[in-house]
Design a protein with these regions (language model features):
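Rossmann-like NAD(P)-binding element
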Residues: 57-74
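N-terminal glycine-rich dinucleotide-binding loop that anchors FAD/FMN and/or NAD(P) in oxidoreductases
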Residues: 44-61
Length: 74
């Protein structure tokens, strides 16, 4: 499985992470503060055309915890 790390869990990073998880990638997000806590507690939610879908996602503020990655998006 392809391992992908995305720095930033805002609108763009979150959208990309959601799409990549749905495609079967092993995605991790680097986030801070309230975003990090929300991802850890509730997962990643995408709301599109009135429909919401929540997926579990790995999230950390310490990239070293993730180990080697195939791709890093920053």
């Amino acid at each position: 499985m392809t391992k992908i790390c995305i720095f930033g869990a805002g609108a763009i990073g979150g959208y990309m992470a959601h799409a990549l998880i749905k495609a079967g990638a092993d995605v991790s997000l680097i986030a801070r503060g309230p975003h990090l806590e929300g991802l850890r507690d509730k997962g990643l939610t995408l709301i599109k055309e009135g429909s919401a879908e929540t997926l579990p996602v790995k999230a950390t503020d310490t990239p070293e915890e993730l180990g080697p990655q195939d791709y890093v998006i920053s």
